[in-house]
Every structure is written in C-alpha cells, then in structure tokens.
C-alpha cells in the first residue's frame, strides 16, 4: 500500500487505538454487521465494507470527502466463539489480522455504553437485510444494506440497498466497492484473501450456486492478482483450488468441539408469527457432519439429543432444527432434525415435507424429536427458514 494508506490490519488496529470521541462523529456511531451466524461471508463482508468506506473517505473518488469518519465492523458473536470458526481464523492469519484487532459483541456493548448521551447508532447490514434480533436494542437506524437472502422488504430507504441473488454476499460487497473505488488495484490486493475465501466457500470453489455477481467478483480479483506474482505467492493465492481446499478442510474440522459448540458454530434464531397465537422461537444450526458421526463422537444418540435439548432450553427455543450437510463421492447429502413440542413439530413437518423431500430415519413425530433425510439437497438454511416460517404462519390455533 502507499505510505498514506493503511492495510486492513493497520486500519483495524487504528480503529482499536482511537478514543470513542474519534470513532463517533457528530453524535453518530456507525457500524457494519453481518448476520448472527458470523460465518466467513458475514465477517468478510463486514470488514471489507468498513475498510473500503475508509479508503473511499480518505481518497479522491468523490468531492464529498468524510475524512476521520469511520464504520466499525462488528462480528456478531462473543469473542470466545471465533475459535470455533477455524476456516475464518486461517484466512485472517493470511491477512495478518490479529484477534485483538477485531470488534465483537462485547466491543459493541462497550462502545454503546461509552458514547456521549444522545449519540445514535447507525448500522450498515451485510449478509442480512434486517437488524439481527440480538442487536435490536443497540441499533437505532439501518442506513445501508447489501445482502443475498430473501428480501424482507424492510428499511427501504437504506442507501445502498442491494438485495439480490448471489452465491456469496461478499461478491456483492466487492463489486459495489470495486466500482466506487474505480478498480483500485492496491485495495483489491489487500482484501483478496478475505473475499476469495468467502466466495470460494459459498460457491464450493465456483461449482455450485454460482451467479453472475460471483463470476464478476472472481474475474476482477484474478485480473489484479495475475499481474502481481510476488504478492500472490506471499498470500498463497497462486492456486485458488488449493486455497479452497485449505479453507474447506478447516471449516469441516469440528473434532473436539462440545455439542453446544457445534450447535452455536453456525446458528441463527428467529421468531415466527402465526395466526392468532404466540410467536414461535426457533433456532437453526447448520452442521458439517452427518448425524451418525455426531452420535459416535458424543456418547450416542440419546446423549446427543439430551444435550441438544439442554441447548434448546438455554436459548428459550420452542423448536430447534439441525441441518446437516456433507459431500461423499461428489454427491451432496443433507439431513434435517427437529426437536420441540410434538404437535408443533408434526404440523411444521407436514407442511414442508414435500418441498424438502423428507424421509424419516430416526426418532418419531410423537416423541418431539424426528430425524429425516432431506432429498432436496439444493435447499439450504436460506430456503428452509422461509418454508418453516410460511408453514407456521398458516397454522390454525
């Protein structure tokens, strides 16, 4: 980078060093946050958006400069949970980003407590198009959105407001800033490992769920990388397939995790509203191993289910859903496990079974825990959540 610019780790370290009076500007504290699963895509999108906005503000891309105005990238988990994301840790190490330079939930709470009275908290949302439930008491205004999930039609006055189909939200974030920063080569080189890591993971190395936005982002990255052999070699990006394999192996490594760790590693929680009855508190955990592996690692089916029920109680959930996925011999496989009140479980499953092509292989609907093979392997949590929400909204009292 030029001597007047900061790299991503330098930018984050600089933010950490500033007093709150310098971070909050004109009685406004601004953050950028992904969704509560805090996966590679959410973390990469939040850091990239905040960093690129800093470069934009400090540069000559617009007459409307906002030097000294910062967006703080927030990772929507406790600091201690970052270690569960071994793929993210690997990519952060590539960029020489230290854990202590990152901002987590604890940091957001501290910032909110220490700003002067009357300071508003504005947020850009990435990999999400509504305020995360756990942050609703902190965020006053949503001022921008870039996301690739189902459009909830909220915060319609946000700017930018980009909600469109994409394999990875990071692709949308990158393309947005690539254009605003006029293809700045230095910036692309600086954020390439973060962006490519997220895009390659979300698209299975550009083989599945690839959209034009993903192709464009990768093409733009590779066009810059191809002219920087030494930098590319230093970052380990000469072979994107090898880079993907390294990340994927770490993402799939959950050996030694407790059941609670596995459930919260990639977790989202929702409140569904139904016809004339109370809301349904539902949590969904995406897991990279099949149920038989989980049983073998954690004392058998009964012990594993008991620990899931404990997690369910601790989170105040009416329903807990586990979505397992893995690949074998080039084929994708999925399972869906649901725990909760037997009547609610039965009603939900009856309404989504055809869409997800569910086949019972364990438990039973009357016992409040049922396990299914999910033959519709294209349906990820991104599709399962709207299916379940629609099913609950149609339940009669």
Curated annotation (Swiss-Prot):
Its EC number is 3.6.1.11. It catalyses: [phosphate](n) + H2O = [phosphate](n-1) + phosphate + H(+). Mg(2+) binds at residues 41, 127, 148. Present with 3170 molecules/cell in log phase SD medium. SMART domains: DHHA2. One of its GO terms (molecular function) is metal ion binding. GO terms for cellular component: cytoplasm. The lineage of its organism: Eukaryota, Fungi, Dikarya, Ascomycota, Saccharomycotina. Pfam families: DHH, DHHA2. Mn(2+) binds at residues 41, 127, 148. Polyphosphatase (polyPase) involved in the degradation of inorganic polyphosphates (polyP) that is able to degrade a range of chains from three to several hundreds of residues in a highly processive manner. Exclusively shows exopolyphosphatase activity, cleaving inside the polyP chain. One of its GO terms (biological process) is polyphosphate catabolic process. Its cofactor is Mn(2+); Mg(2+). ATP binds at residues 149, 286, 381. This is Polyphosphatase. SUPFAM superfamilies: DHH phosphoesterases (SSF64182). Keywords: ATP-binding, Hydrolase, Magnesium, Manganese, Metal-binding, Nucleotide-binding. It is an enzyme of class 3 (hydrolase). InterPro entries: DDH_dom (IPR001667), DHH_sf (IPR038763), DHHA2 (IPR004097), DHHA2_dom_sf (IPR038222). It comes from Saccharomyces cerevisiae (strain ATCC 204508 / S288c) (Baker's yeast). Belongs to the PPase class C family.
